Swiss-Prot record:
Coiled coil: none annotated. Optimum temperature is 15 degrees Celsius. It catalyses: D-glyceraldehyde 3-phosphate = dihydroxyacetone phosphate. It comes from Moritella marina. The lineage of its organism: Bacteria, Pseudomonadati, Pseudomonadota, Gammaproteobacteria, Alteromonadales. This is Triosephosphate isomerase. The gene is tpiA.
Length: 256
């Protein structure tokens, strides 16, 4: 049975004070909550502080990060390696986010190489896929998602998805306040799972597929009630302890 994962992507937000306050607030809000894995991905500069804060609290919250490089060392100014992230306890690494694809021109092939390097280093890739508003209107949603998935599957084999997380994030719903309905999200999640099942039913059955795109406490339960939605990759709501904890609790309750 798939175990739900709710992950907060803090994006380019935070301060030293905010990191400590938010994580301590989350620990308090999540006390006694079981049945869901909760992860946070702070900006790279705050991964160290986040690790120390979580360790001091004896927290079960999983530490992640928002990006990685294709190298573990060398002359790559401004980059950070899987080995460095691993040293600071970060295990769940977001790759392929639409903001990276757009603002940093990261191609499907480049994202697939990051995926492979994370797996090689024993880390968990959180692979973001999803379509733009124009692609959605043109009926190309699944074609885009399949292309982004196949960049990994066709180079590394479908088994590479074992232990990884897929996050379906329709670009038109990220930070816009617009969100796919629970039924529409379920339809796409089922198609994503079916696409993987064409290569391996076992991998498809077990892979965690999150939904991302304006997930809030008010709509989280409706998403998690769907059979193929295994959690959420949360943006704005992850910056508030009560809101993010409410989403995690909704996942735990729905998937119990």
């Amino acid at each position: 049975m798939r175990h739900p994962v709710v992950m907060g992507n803090w994006k380019l937000n935070g301060s030293k004070e905010m990191v400590v306050d938010l994580l301590n607030g989350l620990n308090a809000e999540l006390e006694g909550v079981t049945g869901v894995d909760v992860a946070v991905a702070p900006p790279a500069l705050f991964v160290d502080l986040a690790e120390r804060t979580l360790t001091e609290a004896g927290s079960a919250i999983i530490l992640g990060a928002q990006n990685t490089d294709l190298n573990n060392s060398g002359a790559f100014t401004g980059d950070m390696s899987p080995a460095m992230l691993k040293e600071f306890g970060a295990t769940h690494i977001i790759i392929g986010h639409s903001e990276r694809r757009e603002y940093h021109a990261e191609s499907d092939e480049f994202v697939a190489k990051k995926f492979a390097f994370l797996k090689e280093n024993g880390l968990t890739p959180v692979l973001c896929i999803g379509e733009s508003d124009a692609q959605n209107e043109a009926g190309e949603t699944m074609a885009v998602c399949a292309r982004q998935l196949d960049a990994v599957i066709n180079t590394q084999g479908v088994e590479a998805l074992e232990g990884a997380i897929i996050a379906y994030e329709p670009i038109w719903a990220i930070g816009t306040g617009k969100a796919a309905t629970a039924e529409d999200a379920q339809r796409i999640h089922a198609q994503i799972r079916a696409h993987i099942a064409e290569k391996s039913e076992a991998v498809a059955k077990n892979v965690v597929i999150q939904y991302g795109g304006s997930v809030k406490p008010e709509n989280a339960a409706a998403y998690f009630a769907q059979p193929d939605i295994d959690g959420a990759l949360v943006g704005g709501a992850a910056l508030d302890a009560k809101s993010f904890a409410a989403i995690a609790k909704a996942a735990a309750e729905a998937k119990a």
